[in-house]
Swiss-Prot record:
This is Probable potassium transport system protein Kup. One of its GO terms (cellular component) is plasma membrane. Keywords: Cell inner membrane, Cell membrane, Ion transport, Membrane, Potassium, Potassium transport, Symport, Transmembrane, Transmembrane helix, Transport. Pfam families: K_trans (PF02705), K_trans_C (PF22776). The chain crosses the membrane at residues 24-44, 67-87, 115-135, 153-173, 181-201, 228-248, 263-283, 301-321, 353-373, 382-402, 413-433, 435-455.
Amino acid sequence: MQVEHEVATEGGQAPASSGHRKGIAGLAVAAIGVVYGDIGTSPLYTLKEVFNGPHAVPVNEANVYGILSLVFWALVTVVSAKYVVFITRADNRGEGGIMALTSLALRVVQPGRRAWWLSVLGVFGAALFYGDGMITPAISVLSAVEGLEVATPAFKPFVIPIALVVLVGLFVMQRRGTGSVGAIFGPVMVCWFLVLAVLGINGITLHPEIIGALDPRWAARFFIDQPLIGWLALGAVVLAITGGEALYADMGHFGRRPIKLAWFSLVFPALYLNYLGQGALILDHPDNVRNPFYMLVPDALVYPMVGMATLATIIASQAVISGAFSLTRQAIQLGYAPRMQTLHTSEHEIGQIYVPGVNWMLLGAVVALVVGFQSSSALASAYGIAVTLTMMIDTVLAFVVVRSLWKWGRAKAVLFLVVFLAVDIAFFSATTVKIFAGGWFPLLIGAAIFTLLRTWKRGRSLLNERIRSDTMPLDIFIQSMFQSPPPRVEGTAVFMTTWLDGVPRALLHNLIHNKVLHERVVLLRVDTADVPHVPEGERVEVEEIDYGFYRVRVHYGFKDDPDIPAALGLCAQRGLPFDMMETSFFLGRETLVSRVGSGMPQWREKLFILLFRNAGSAADYFCIPPNRVVELGTQVEL
């Protein structure tokens, strides 16, 4: 069951908890440090890949102008128009991201086949994020450290070891959180974008006419004259917009206005000035295509620039890693993933979490990518395909929102879909040529994560149906208590359950084995709403039944942290006070047994049982004191 009190708006604003405490300029600076790290490090490798990659575009004036025009209009169409102007208006109580967008789309669709497909799309888009999250740190840090080769070729053997040291250090430090250094991310990235702009302007002086590349006719002519080369080039041009989808995912931290201000006032101009500078440099010295970004840097400043670029890529990688932690928590809350150990790394910022299992999975994959691909150019072949797929999914989900939730007219909504989906498909089709060169990796990771998420969701549904079919109705149970009442003992017993109208198995087992009931018996259900946060005033519902029995329903948003003792503390306002020292929590611990005809293929059934056995403790996940927990085992045929 979901809480139906949320309000969807067209036009996301900064969350009240942050937007009213900080000025919009301060939030914009903070957003630059988190939201734009990924796209902000794209100049390190984008044009190098275009003119020096496996499908290298020949260097001549028409081609350089055409590519720069493509980059500009990709940034305008995909990032500026689609994400900054349109999709960021689709906020779910101030929150963004593909989970929030999926929730908005499902809210206006009747249950059925269409809703199922939208749900599948949303989950697949979320799964693709993990593949992207593995490649981003690897390609970003590698491309930064490769600047040492520009300073002197003698550093070439040390690039991989240095990159690995940086990356391993980054993941090892996750346990400590970023609270102590997070405040400097914004100012550091502001400096980074200012440096990008200055380097770009310096390069533009070599060929001032390069500014004419803003004319879309250059891009059109490039495609008309060389359609195949133009199409293949899109597979590298897409690197300029990777990370654009992140600005919507992080909207909940800063709000729409600061993200929009940061993009149009600094990030977009700085990025494109740098691309123009690199283009001018390539026209002036075609040999510079081997690393046009670092060739823009004066010789005396190459080493400091490598240091600054490495710091910028660390910040960009941190945003992706934190995003993976946050997405995992949302998946757990929404019932798509088993419980995992989740640690808070800050006493002040509730959103700063650390998920050890995800952290080490990402580290292992990142190290394998760096060792396996050896260079940022090789990694570029694996990059982009997952991002473009995610962007296509965002467009489809956004179309449902603008048509059904915002009530746009059919013509206007279809125009939105056709324009942006055409651009997305063009980029995606161009990246498909990378599949055998490395693009298979994020697709494989995405497919694997998607399978895990859907298997867990389906398995939990089947398990709940099985338990439900064997559950005794609560009213019949209470009537039997009147006929032959068992002894009552002091205190309160809390039984967590999925159905408040049935008797939890743990309650029956306790009664059968211990022959007693507590003075107060509380049946507690936890619901996750399709909104990011549920206000404290709407956290709990209490219903007194009879014979000392109570029903308590606790509501959380998909970005809230479940804390059952804290929630029960709110029940006093509803006439049901709790004393934790007099309260025992009875949790059922099921042992699953496979059977024929369970409703899932045998391999998925075995996978679900494996996931179930390794799921984290319910007591830990719900912050229940271990010394107040009683676990009662039961066997269930799946």
